[in-house]
Amino acid sequence: MPSLRQKVTTYFRQLSFIAEPREGRRRASEHEDDDGSFITKYLEGRMQRQFVEGPEIYNGQNPTDMPVLKLDTYEAGNCSITAACTGPDEGLTGIKRSKLHLSTSFADDIDFIDTQQENDDCYGVRRSTPPVQVATQNSTRLTSKFGRPPAGPRRQSSAEQPSGSASASGMRSRKNSKSSIANLAAASAGTDAGKANSDQNNRNVLNAKTEVSTDGDPNSERERLLREAVSNQGGSDPAALIAGVENWRMECDFAYGISVSLYETNMLTKEPMGNPIADCYGMVVRGDSAAMAMADGVNWGDGARLAARSAVHGCLDYLDRAVFGQALECRATTTQEVFVSLLRSLWEGHGCILEVGGALSTLTIAVVLPLDGAPGKYVVCSCNVGDSLGYVYSKKHGVRELTQASHDISSMRDMRDALGALGPADGNKPELSNLTFSMTCIESGDIVFLTSDGISDNFDPVVGKFAEAWTPDVKLQTSGHVKPANLAPKRQNKSASAIYARLHPSTPPTRPARQSKAESPPNNAPSRPKYMRSQTLIEPRQGLVSAPPPSVVPQRIPKSISGLPLVTGPQRHALTLYRLEDLLSYGINGTFSPCVSARRLCHLLIDFVRMITSARRKTLEQRELFYKLSTGPDGAKREVQLNRMQHRAARKRVVDSSAFVALPGKLDHATVMAYTVGGGEEHNNGNENGDGGAISPVLQSKEFKETNF
């Protein structure tokens, strides 16, 4: 039985509801109905983010364009590795490269990937825009040192490479044989006198600053020591080690990666279409620092997978020797040194692709290092080519795209264009039209994650069919409840009585004048008492009674004929980040707590893209695309298996249909790799609590409810 307090409270609520005007209640219900989607709130300008603005993201096209920050000491060497992972399958370990064993005496004759060569015409880079002319000679010299690509495959088999190819092209090739080293030493000894000055100019300053140092600077001595240290490390490690790692299955909660195929499963072979997965990722964590690399092979096939694995293999192996080497000369002290090493590792990945004969691949590299004089503060430096993107998630600042400058957010780009790629894009030259360096400051607990376009594109509101791109050829939805163009002519809108009165006019009847009634005699009896309004009435809110001012009325968003809101390029990019924020902060069904581990983040992203593309997969897994009904000689109908060409034709017919185009999502290879900053320090505490080593299960799409995205 309800208590007295409950009865009084219910009575007050009833009084408040009765006293509220009907117009106010109707407006309140309409406001609640329009408040369901954050996309609508963002487009109407009513969205209130609970995140504060994060640190600035710096970007540039050259290592000298980036600000210089001093780094704190960090752990290096093979013994300091706390986590390492690669994939899918064997990942970068599927590439077997024979390393060149060199001694210190041949350090100056190493064909470093960033050394300026005499024949600059052989090392041009294909770019969509002409290179910027640098005014000063020093800047030109520094740029040429940073951006020199290799002219061709660094190693070829003896059957494919002619003996005189190296001398004919004017390039020193790196071969894994003692005779090659002897020939290289003899050739260099014969030309030492003529190349003394050019060799001095060709030395790269790894400890680069904004101004190029003059001859005689101690940096030249540091450069010589660095070259010797990097070359000696190549022959000191066992052949089984790749990037200094012996066991690549050391993933954990703070360092994790997943790669899956979103394509449909072939009903006959029981394998996903598009195999093998042409993505590759690799990550090495040393204490509070990490090196990450993500590659996405262009198109399908073994060539694309080989290119992705080679790119990750080459860049991580170089970073292991140049940034995380055993020697002190191989450890970076400023962020500019890190960017120089990132660019060199990118070219090393390109050279590895040419060595193994791979196709094209995108590449995104990120290095997380601690900042000097700021405990708990870190910096992430990245270099990317193509459409594999990098992000930073923080419970304080939300989601920020680290590689935002690599693509134009103000335009509606074609999702099928990778924008750039390593490998033989133009002869033996890569496509570096969107080569971008990025940097931002992060804190302990933030999560840095790299994704392929199979992840990032499926968070796009246009790809997810939550909105439509506002292009010049799109048709807008007309506003208003009544369409004047569909109304009948005025004469046809007349009623039958109105038409009859118009055709048969008559004099309307006149109404007699009213007479005033006599006044009633005064009544001296006491009148009935009038009840006053209850003083316990709870007055309704002012905003529900009175109409809102014109400035508060949300702006009407333009919509297409299909009813979807139209978004511009910047709005499209912002909504992509907001969807990532919403997923990582509240989960798929909006009831989870913010994501705190790299493992959980990877599973959330993979589960989301699986869900949003499930309709397309189910459509392409229909039995009619693999079998057809055929009538036999006895007149009985039976199923006949389609051959490969017939299946391709049937699949293409379904994919090109308007019904399939209207389905949300994009079928692709989806890969994500994440690292929790400073996670290695808290790893032991997590294991003591009993949840540090728990493996999150791969959740299926059917276990989730629909989200209010």
From Swiss-Prot:
- What are the residue boundaries of the PPM-type phosphatase domain, all occurrences included? 259-503
Mutating residue 345 to G leads to what result? In RNA edited version
Q: What is this protein called?
A: PP2C-like domain-containing protein CG9801
Q: Name one Pfam family in it.
A: PP2C_2
Q: Where is the composition biased (Low complexity)?
A: 182-196
**Gene source species:** Drosophila melanogaster
This protein's source sits in the domain of life called: Eukaryota
Q: Where is the composition biased (Polar residues)?
A: 130-143, 197-217
Region entry Disordered, spans:
121-222, 503-530, 678-709
Q: Which PROSITE patterns does UniProt cross-reference here? A: PPM_2 (PS51746)
The signal peptide, as residue positions, is none
InterPro entries tied to this protein? PP2C-like_domain, PPM-type-like_dom_sf, PPM-type_phosphatase-like_dom
